[in-house]
C-alpha cells in the first residue's frame, strides 16, 4: 500500500447527496445494474485514452492491450473492477465523483415524487453511473492515475456515500482506475465468479473491450495457481460491426442502455452499413422515454462518433438536425480522418451527405414504427411529438415526410388524444372538400367548445384541434400537405368553397345586406377595439365571435413573443355577428344608443372569452354585466 499524502475530507454537492439517497432506495430491486454502469464507465475511459493517444502516443505507456478486469474476494466481501483506460487526476476525481455537472439537475430532483417505482424510472433516465456502486456497497475505494502523469500523482478517493468523501495523493505505477466495492451485509452474492459472469454476459456482452474474470478451477484443478489466470467472458467486439442477422434483440437493447445511459429498452432501432461513395455504419435508437433535459436546448445531444472503430467523441451533434436530438446511437465512418475535430466536422461536405442520409433513415424508422406498431408510436408521440413539430421549420427538404408523422387531436372523436395523422384526415374528407381545417388554442377543452367550430359541426366537417404551444408557429411553416392547403378556421373570411351550396352563398349575401345598418352602429361603438364588423358564416348557435385578420398573429404566437421579451405588433380582431341569433335581433331593435353601446361591449367581451383571449378591462365587463342583470331582475 503506498503512502498517502495531501489527504483531505470534502463534502458532496447537495444534489449528489439527494441522488445517492434516492438511488439506493429506488433502484434496489434492480441492484445488479451497478456492474453494468461501472463497466460502461471503464469502456468510456478506454475510448477516451485511444482518442487522446492519436495525438499523444506516449499516453499508452507501453501499449498493453486495453481491457477491464473484474475480481472478487469472498473473505473480504469485496468486488474489484479495474481498467487501464485514461484514468483520473486528483482534480478529475473531485469533480466527477463529488459533483453532478448536468444542467437541469435541480429541476430533475424536484420531479422526484417519493414513489419508488416512478422515481426509479426518473433516476434511470438521469443516468447514475458511478454512484450505482452504493446500491450494493457501504464503502467504495477508487484508486486512479491519469495517463501521462507520473506514478507519484495517483489519487485515492474513498467514501461511505453518506455526505462526504476522502481524497489523497498516492503512488500508482499503472495508469487507469481500480474501484473496490466493500459489499453491504446481505450482498455477498456478488462476491462470486458465477454471479459476476452472468451479470456481465447479461448486460455487457456488447462492450468492445475484453472483460476478464479470474479463471475458476474445480475438482482436481481446485489448487489454484498463486497468480490468477484471466479469461475473457464477453464477446469483446463492437456490436455495430457485426452482421445484423447475428445480433439478438436483447443485445441491441443492452447496447442501447450502454450508449444512452438509460435503464429502459428503446422503442425501435435501425442498424445499417453503407458502402460505395461513402462508407459508414450507423446504429440509431429511438428511446422509450424523453430525457429530463429534452427541452434544454443547450443540453448535450448527438451520436457517439467512431472512425474506423476508434472512438472520436461523444455527442457529435453534426449528424442529425436539432429536431431529432432525442435519437441515440453510434456512427462509425471510414471516410473521416482520425484527427477529426468538431471544427472540421462543421465544414466537411462528407458530414452533410451523412447527415442527410441519417436523417432520412430516422424518419423511415419512425414511419415504420407508426405503420407496424401504432401503440409504440403513440408512446413515441407522447414523449417526443412536440420536438418533432420543430422539424418543418428546420428541415424544408423533409417537410412532407415529417408532416406525415405528426399527430393531432380532432373533432372526429371526443378523446382529446393526439392520434390523427394527416393521411387519416384526408381519407375522411367530405366530398368536395379540398382543404385541411384546423383551430389553435390554449387547451383541448377551450377549442373543442369554440364557436368557430359551429358551422363545421353542422356540416359534419372534421377540424384538427391544435393546443400545443408550438402549434401556431408550426403551421406558419406548413402551408399544405399532399396538395391540400391548411386553413385556420379562426382566421380571415371563412370560405368553405364547394361545401357551401349556391343557395347558401346567396342567402348569406342577402342577410349581410339586410344587416348593414346594424354593422354601421356596431362599428361606431367598437371602433377602437375592432378592425372590422361583419356578418359571420361561422356561427349557428352563438351570437358573436372574434376572428383573426389574415396577416395578424394569433394568440399562441403573441404569447410566445411576449414571453421571449419581443415587441408584439398591435392588431385588432374582426367582430363577426350571427344575424339569426335572438340577442343580435334584440340588439338590432334597441333604440337607446347608450344601452346599445353597453350591450355591444358585453357581446364583444364574451366573444373574446370564447376565443380564449383575456379581457383588457375585466372590471368594466363585470360592471356592465351586473347592470344588465339588475335591469333583467327588476
From Swiss-Prot:
Residues 343-559 are annotated as: B. Keywords: ATP-binding, Chaperone, Cytoplasm, Nucleotide-binding, Stress response. PROSITE patterns: HSP90. One of its GO terms (cellular component) is cytosol. Gene3D superfamilies: 3.30.230.80, 3.40.50.11260, Heat shock protein 90, C-terminal domain, Histidine kinase-like ATPase, C-terminal domain. It is found in: Cytoplasm. InterPro entries: HATPase_C_sf, Heat_shock_protein_90_CS, HSP90_C, Hsp90_fam, Hsp90_N, Ribosomal_Su5_D2-typ_SF. Molecular chaperone. Has ATPase activity. This is Chaperone protein HtpG. The gene is htpG.
Amino acid at each position: 500500500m503506498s503512502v498517502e499524502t495531501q489527504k483531505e475530507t470534502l463534502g458532496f454537492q447537495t444534489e449528489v447527496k439527494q441522488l445517492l439517497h434516492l438511488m439506493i432506495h429506488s433502484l434496489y430491486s434492480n441492484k445488479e445494474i451497478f456492474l453494468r454502469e461501472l463497466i460502461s464507465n471503464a469502456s468510456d475511459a478506454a475510448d477516451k485514452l485511444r482518442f487522446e493517444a492519436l495525438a499523444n502516443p506516449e499516453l499508452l505507456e507501453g501499449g498493453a492491450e486495453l481491457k477491464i478486469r473484474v475480481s472478487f474476494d469472498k473473505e473480504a466481501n469485496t468486488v474489484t473492477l479495474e481498467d487501464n483506460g485514461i484514468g483520473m487526476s486528483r482534480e478529475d476525481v473531485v469533480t466527477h465523483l463529488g459533483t453532478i455537472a448536468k444542467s437541469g439537475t435541480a429541476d430533475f430532483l424536484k420531479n422526484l415524487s417519493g414513489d419508488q417505482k416512478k422515481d426509479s424510472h426518473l433516476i434511470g433516465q438521469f443516468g447514475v453511473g458511478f454512484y450505482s456502486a452504493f446500491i450494493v456497497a457501504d464503502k467504495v475505494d477508487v484508486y486512479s492515475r491519469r495517463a501521462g502523469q507520473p506514478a507519484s500523482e495517483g489519487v485515492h478517493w474513498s467514501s461511505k456515500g453518506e455526505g462526504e468523501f476522502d481524497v489523497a495523493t498516492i503512488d500508482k505505477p499503472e495508469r487507469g482506475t481500480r474501484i473496490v466495492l466493500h459489499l453491504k451485509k446481505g450482498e455477498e452474492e456478488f462476491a462470486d465468479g458465477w454471479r459476476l459472469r452472468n451479470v456481465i454476459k447479461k448486460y455487457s456482452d456488447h462492450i468492445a473491450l475484453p472483460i476478464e474474470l479470474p479463471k475458476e478451477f474445480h475438482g482436481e484443478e481446485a489448487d489454484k495457481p498463486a497468480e490468477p489466470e484471466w479469461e475473457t467472458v464477453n464477446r469483446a467486439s463492437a456490436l455495430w460491426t457485426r452482421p445484423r442477422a447475428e445480433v439478438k434483440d436483447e443485445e441491441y437493447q443492452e447496447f442501447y442502455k450502454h450508449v444512452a445511459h438509460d435503464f429502459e429498452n428503446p422503442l425501435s432501432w435501425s442498424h445499417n452499413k453503407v458502402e460505395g461513395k461513402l462508407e459508414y455504419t450507423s446504429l440509431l435508437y429511438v428511446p422509450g422515454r424523453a430525457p429530463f433535459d429534452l427541452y434544454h436546448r443547450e443540453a448535450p445531444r448527438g451520436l457517439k462518433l467512431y472512425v474506423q472503430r476508434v472512438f472520436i467523441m461523444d455527442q457529435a451533434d453534426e449528424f442529425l438536425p436539432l429536431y431529432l436530438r432525442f435519437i441515440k446511437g453510434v456512427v462509425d465512418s471510414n471516410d473521416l480522418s482520425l484527427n477529426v475535430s468538431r471544427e472540421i466536422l462543421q465544414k466537411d461536405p462528407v458530414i452533410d451527405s451523412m447527415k442527410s442520409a441519417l436523417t432520412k433513415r430516422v424518419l423511415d424508422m419512425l414511419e415504420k414504427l407508426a405503420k407496424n406498431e401504432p401503440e409504440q408510436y403513440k408512446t413515441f408521440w407522447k414523449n417526443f411529438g412536440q420536438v418533432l413539430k420543430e422539424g418543418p421549420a428546420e428541415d424544408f427538404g423533409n417537410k412532407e415526410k415529417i408532416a406525415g408523422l405528426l399527430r393531432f387531436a380532432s373533432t372526429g372523436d371526443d378523446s382529446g388524444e393526439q392520434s390523427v395523422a394527416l393521411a387519416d384526415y384526408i381519407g375522411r374528407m367530405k366530398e368536395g372538400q379540398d382543404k385541411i381545417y384546423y383551430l389553435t388554442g390554449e387547451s383541448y377543452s377551450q377549442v373543442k367548445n369554440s364557436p368557430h367550430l359551429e358551422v363545421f359541426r353542422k356540416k359534419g366537417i372534421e377540424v384538427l384541434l391544435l393546443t400545443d404551444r408550438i402549434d401556431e408557429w408550426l403551421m406558419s411553416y406548413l402551408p399544405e400537405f399532399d396538395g391540400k392547403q391548411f386553413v385556420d378556421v379562426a382566421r380571415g373570411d371563412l370560405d368553405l368553397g364547394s361545401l357551401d351550396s349556391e343557395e347558401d352563398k346567396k342567402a348569406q349575401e342577402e342577410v349581410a345586406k339586410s344587416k348593414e345598418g346594424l354593422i354601421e352602429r356596431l362599428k361606431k361603438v367598437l371602433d377602437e377595439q375592432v378592425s372590422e364588423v361583419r356578418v359571420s358564416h361561422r356561427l349557428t348557435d352563438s351570437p358573436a365571435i372574434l376572428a383573426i385578420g389574415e396577416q395578424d398573429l394569433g394568440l399562441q404566437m403573441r404569447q410566445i413573443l411576449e414571453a421571449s421579451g419581443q415587441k408584439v405588433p398591435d392588431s385588432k380582431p374582426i367582430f363577426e355577428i350571427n344575424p339569426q341569433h335572438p340577442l343580435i335581433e334584440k340588439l338590432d331593435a334597441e333604440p337607446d344608443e347608450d344601452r346599445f353601446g353597453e350591450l355591444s361591449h358585453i357581446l364583444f367581451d364574451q366573444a373574446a372569452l370564447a376565443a380564449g383571449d383575456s379581457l383588457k378591462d375585466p372590471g368594466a365587463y363585470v360592471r356592465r354585466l351586473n347592470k344588465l342583470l339588475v335591469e333583467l331582475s327588476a
